[in-house]
Amino acid sequence: ELRANPVVTRLGKKHDVVMDAQQQLLQLLVKELNLETELPAKQEKSAYKRLLLEKGGEAFSQRLTEILEINPLYAERLQQGGLLSDHLEWALKACVDRTLEHWFIKQGERLGFKPVADDNNLSKLQNSAYQWHSLSAKGGKGDKAGFSSVDFTGELQITDMEKFKQALFVGIGRSKAFGCGLLLVRRCG
């Protein structure tokens, strides 16, 4: 088990991996559907969602279906029906799951481990409990000061014992002072 603060760096600035993945997908969908000129001046996530749901039409619905069919978990949900807004939320979650898995794999390559896959070659890694932790405002950051955390659970295979020992004792990623990056390891079986 691992609670981590996954971040991505763009143009020298660190961004929350989850929020970045969602924003990237929404921007891509708006661009693919040629709706960029319809965006309001304040381009928050809710504005993208509203625009896509109101003006995306059948092309948007079809694109969400394509995104969801790639992931077995969400393809199963797709068979249950649901509203277009549900499909958008599932597509965002599928995108986040994929992004977090890539982040975790990248950490493992650097730190001597990899997630174990099942018989269908799907990772046994699960993520849950995404949270935003607000910190008291210092330095003029206002209410945006804080960090996010995600809990990972799954099976690992150690690929480099020395690197893994270092990760086990030092931790993974950022926000270790806030309890992130600490591995809880148990023997399988």
Regions found by a protein language model. Name each.
Residues 1-189:
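RNA-interacting cores
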